[in-house]
Amino acid sequence: MAAAAVARLWWRGILGASALTRGTGRPSVLLLPVRRESAGADTRPTVRPRNDVAHKQLSAFGEYVAEILPKYVQQVQVSCFNELEVCIHPDGVIPVLTFLRDHTNAQFKSLVDLTAVDVPTRQNRFEIVYNLLSLRFNSRIRVKTYTDELTPIESAVSVFKAANWYEREIWDMFGVFFANHPDLRRILTDYGFEGHPFRKDFPLSGYVELRYDDEVKRVVAEPVELAQEFRKFDLNSPWEAFPVYRQPPESLKLEAGDKNLMPN
């Protein structure tokens, strides 16, 4: 009797498996249930919400850095998206970056980006921005410093090897000189290029024009020639992204020699 019961169970198992293969049987209880959710429209914003806990931790760490390096740290702030920014004196580039890289509570060992911002209305028009990443604590920090056209900034290659090409790009595009750089030369523009294209006062047309001369069978460089006479364009726009960096427009003044040009 026991052997017959086992045989019947074995035969029912085969029939059940074949029925499932044909799609005519019921699913087995061992199958995991599929979770289905409604595909309703999500109207929530896609921005990252504010995290008060992370905001407090970043603020505390920023204050800690300011206490350790009071000679160099000038300002510490946390943005609304939990991004820590440390503004330092130009002389503190190497000490601050070394501290953030080697300290046990920091471990910012990756330089993910190094760039510059040109604000001509400031006395120190160039803002140098270092973006660091800590894989140990899954955290980021932004270090900012400043300089002008003539004052050099200490190169960060001795702290982060990745700063080599970043600093070459800043020198090429903005003209910021990095002292003690192992190979500070242009990296994007051609040899003999004049000026620095990312400066706000760099003309859109450039200073020279490169074209192929069919007579000499090579590329020649010539000064830019405008096809029309110079006009003064209105640089103030209602869609200006950074209006606070613009100087207020000067009111037009009527000189004595221009009175005859006014319509009667």
Swiss-Prot record:
This is NADH dehydrogenase [ubiquinone] iron-sulfur protein 3, mitochondrial. NCBIfam families: NuoC_fam (TIGR01961), PRK06074.1-5 (NF004733). GO terms for biological process: mitochondrial electron transport, NADH to ubiquinone; mitochondrial respiratory chain complex I assembly; reactive oxygen species metabolic process. PANTHER family: NADH DEHYDROGENASE [UBIQUINONE] IRON-SULFUR PROTEIN 3, MITOCHONDRIAL, NADH DEHYDROGENASE UBIQUINONE IRON-SULFUR PROTEIN 3. The lineage of its organism: Eukaryota, Metazoa, Chordata, Craniata, Vertebrata. GO terms for cellular component: mitochondrial inner membrane; mitochondrial membrane; respiratory chain complex I. Coiled coil: none annotated. Its EC number is 7.1.1.2.
